[in-house]
């Protein structure tokens, strides 16, 4: 869902979030909330990776879909994303060192689009998430450095690479 910005600003009305919960989430294969979105969906503050995984599992069970709880909004040196399914405690955890850059605008949308594309190519979900994360990481490293503040990613750096590389 694109519900809450990095700044903490709510991007859509609460009734739209209720509609997403009621109509969209039960149809979804995967939802990819960032930490503020996950906290909003869970209705509580999440203080550590255990609480994040528990909240993601609760949401996965409620909506019978997978949840990729993204860890980019923490202050940790490593970003941990946790993938859980509706019938599992924890499917997988993915971790990488944080890249020190302000050029991260669009990382969540890029990741969810990459995963959806890879699923469309027939890759299993966990593999699609792993490759999608690698794609986003390379795009962050190739960011052109435009403007001030949170700049765009460098998607062009990876356009000619195979989806399985």
Predicted regions located by residue number:
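Conserved phosphate/ATP/ADP-binding segment of small-molecule kinases
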Residues: 14-91
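Residues at secondary-structure transition points
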Residues: 11-15, 50, 102-106
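Phosphate-handling active-site elements
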Residues: 90-92, 118-132
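Short clusters of hydrophobic/aromatic residues that line enzyme substrate/ligand-binding pockets
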Residues: 11-12, 46, 94, 153
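Short, small-residue alpha-helix embedded
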Residues: 39-40, 101-125
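Glycine-rich beta-alpha junction loops
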Residues: 3, 37, 72-75, 97-100, ...
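Charged C-terminal helix
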Residues: 126-165
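Conserved beta-loop-beta/alpha segment of the NTase-like Rossmann-fold superfamily
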Residues: 5-7
């Amino acid at each position: 869902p694109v519900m809450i910005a990095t700044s903490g600003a709510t991007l859509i009305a609460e009734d739209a979030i209720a509609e997403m919960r009621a109509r969209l989430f039960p149809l979804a294969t995967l939802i990819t909330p960032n930490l503020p979105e996950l906290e909003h969906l869970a209705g509580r503050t999440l203080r550590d990776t255990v609480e994040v995984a528990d909240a993601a599992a609760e949401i996965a069970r409620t909506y019978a879909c997978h949840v990729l709880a993204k860890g980019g909004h923490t202050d940790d040196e490593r970003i941990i994303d946790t993938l859980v399914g509706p019938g599992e405690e924890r499917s997988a955890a993915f971790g990488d060192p944080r890249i020190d850059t302000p050029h991260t605008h669009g990382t969540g949308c890029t990741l969810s689009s990459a995963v959806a594309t890879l699923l469309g190519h027939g890759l299993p979900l966990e593999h699609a998430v792993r490759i999608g994360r690698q794609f986003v990481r390379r795009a962050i490293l190739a960011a052109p450095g435009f403007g001030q503040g949170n700049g765009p990613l460098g998607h062009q750096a990876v356009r000619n690479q195979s989806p399985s590389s």
